[in-house]
Amino acid sequence: MEVVIVTGMSGAGKSASSHILEDLGYYTLDNMPPSLLLSFIDLTTKSKKKINKIACVVDIRGGEFFADLMKSITLLKNQSIDVKILYLDASDEILIRRYKEHRRPHPLAINGNISQGISNERELLSEVRNSADSIINTSNLTLGELRRKILYVFSLKDVDTKLAISVVSFGFKHGILLDADLVFDVRFLPNPYYIEELKKSSGLNTDIKDYVFGFDEANEFLDKLVDMVEFLIPKYSKEGKTNLVIGIGCTGGKHRSVAIAQALTARLEGNGEKVYVSHRDQKFW
């Protein structure tokens, strides 16, 4: 079993690092009391559900229990468990700026004095920092750069980091797709709903596909859409994004949006992308 202890300065990116590790297959827990670490690992090893990689965020919020951390880590290592300490740090200036931007009190600040709180925290964390396997300074890192640092630190070069793309058709009359990163309105295309023999078919049927793509503007739109998505994929990946939801909307979510969503998925898959297609309003067909 591999256990990563994510710790470090408040505001340095422990939560973001935990989310990155979760995306990479780690079972993650936030604000784990050090005194419960041994018990949790013991329960995990005895569990029927096989968990091989765990990441626990342990920080100064643990109060007096934080002093138990190094003792717990030593005991885990004595059990032949692979324990690594990932320590997140940042300059005082950056930490102060982050706290002011988010308007949150530092856990060790006295009378709102952030600088003094940071100083107190550095002193309390000095032993853990000196024992860390890896220290990442996030002062000037974007989320994407932090992700790449973590991949490098834990030798996860073989992890599948390809952006997962979800293409979802929907009908505007049933509401916009709220969780979409990108939304495209295809109501500019002729609507097969008004052709009696096509009305009952859906965009999954050949007759609707043939009708929609019988218009030059549909083919031109698809070509431009594929080009744009392929342009954006590496940009999103660079910033650490792991999932991209693309919404394709028409009036009812049955004809045009479905045909375009299916065609977009096929084109992206043909380019080697990892794509999943779904049709939100299929229940209304």
Curated annotation (Swiss-Prot):
Keywords, in A-Z order: ATP-binding, GTP-binding, Nucleotide-binding
Keyword GTP-binding: yes
Protein residues bound to ATP: G8, M9, S10, G11, A12, G13, K14, S15
Keyword Nucleotide-binding: yes
Binding sites annotated in the UniProt record for GTP: D59, I60, R61, G62
Recorded superkingdom: Bacteria
PANTHER family: RNASE ADAPTER PROTEIN RAPZ
Primary role: Displays ATPase and GTPase activities.
Protein name per UniProt: Nucleotide-binding protein FMG_1084
Organism this protein belongs to: Finegoldia magna (strain ATCC 29328 / DSM 20472 / WAL 2508)
